[in-house]
Amino acid sequence: MDYRAASSNKRYYVCSKVDIEFIKDEVLSIIDYDYQQMMLQSVPNGDHQYGVGRLEKYKESEDLFCVPVFPELRYTNEIIKRLRMYRSRIMIMKNGCYSWHADSTPRIHIPIITDIDKCFMVVEDEVIRMPVSEDVYWVDTTREHTFVNTSNDNRVHIVGCVS
């Protein structure tokens, strides 16, 4: 089955190509599995935890989270900049399901580690599967959505806001 076909109603599409092995190597060099999220971009003087969770906790607007937290991730930071992402973070999802919600902006998703048969996103009434590949996915997360991991393994991906 080809999981990479674009949605017919633009809930998601492949928006770019990357060297996923390079990104994976960089991400795995800094990842800490004690966290569910690690910021890749924050505000000036922010750390890898300043910006996680609900934005209402922070005084800054989402678009101000644009300073790389890990300068050593040169290729990953270059991709984030090229795709005009902000408030980008590593998501580490254990077995479970996120709440049904809508975000204020669309999101870019770059899968790093996933079980394509047991991890999927639901946007409105459409199931979306994003395999680990060179593909980068734009997803209209302003629509109601959730993410599900039924695997016993963590799912790791990069997610970032775009306007």
Give names to the regions the model predicted.
Residues 1-80:
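Non-heme Fe(II)/2-oxoglutarate
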Residues 74-95:
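A short glycine-rich, His/Asp/Glu-containing loop-to-beta-strand
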Residues 86, 104-106, 154:
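Residues that flank catalytic or metal-binding motifs in active/ligand-binding sites
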Residues 92-93, 102-118:
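Short, conserved beta-strand element in jelly-roll/cupin
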Residues 97, 118, 137, 142-148:
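Histidine-centered metal-chelating micro-motifs
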Residues 101-104, 123, 149-152:
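Short glycine/proline-enriched turns and hinge-like loops at secondary-structure junctions
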Residues 108-111, 136-138, 152-163:
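A short hydrophobic beta-strand segment most commonly corresponding to one strand
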Residues 111-132:
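A short beta-strand-loop-beta hairpin characteristic of the jelly-roll/cupin
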